[in-house]
């Protein structure tokens, strides 16, 4: 991991097309701005981890969940 020290207003380049700007420091947090092409997905790691955990939980649903869904949804076909 590369660790850099930057002041508000200073920038970090990632490749040729991603720019991270330090906006301001707030207490024990930092506000940053990210400029990237539209095709680049930018997510906070805690959101990605929460979605992954929810997907795992959903994939492990028991038979009672299947029966509940069958009673709610119309028959296929």
From Swiss-Prot:
Q: Which SUPFAM superfamilies match?
A: CsrA-like
Where, subcellularly, is it found? Cytoplasm
Which terms are listed as keywords in the entry?
Bacterial flagellum biogenesis, Cytoplasm, Repressor, RNA-binding, Translation regulation
Q: Name one GO molecular function term.
A: mRNA 5'-UTR binding
Presence of the UniProt keyword RNA-binding in the record: yes
UniProt main location, coarse? cytoplasm
Q: What is this protein called?
A: Translational regulator CsrA
Q: Which organism is it from?
A: Pseudarthrobacter chlorophenolicus (strain ATCC 700700 / DSM 12829 / CIP 107037 / JCM 12360 / KCTC 9906 / NCIMB 13794 / A6) (Arthrobacter chlorophenolicus)
């Amino acid at each position: 991991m590369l660790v850099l020290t930057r002041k508000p207003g200073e920038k970090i380049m990632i490749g040729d097309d991603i720019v991270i700007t330090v906006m301001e420091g707030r207490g024990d947090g930092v506000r940053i701005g990210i400029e990237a092409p539209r095709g680049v997905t930018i997510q906070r790691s805690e959101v990605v981890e929460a979605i992954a955990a929810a997907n795992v939980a959903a994939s492990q649903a028991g038979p009672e969940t299947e029966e509940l869904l069958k009673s709610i949804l119309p028959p296929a076909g």
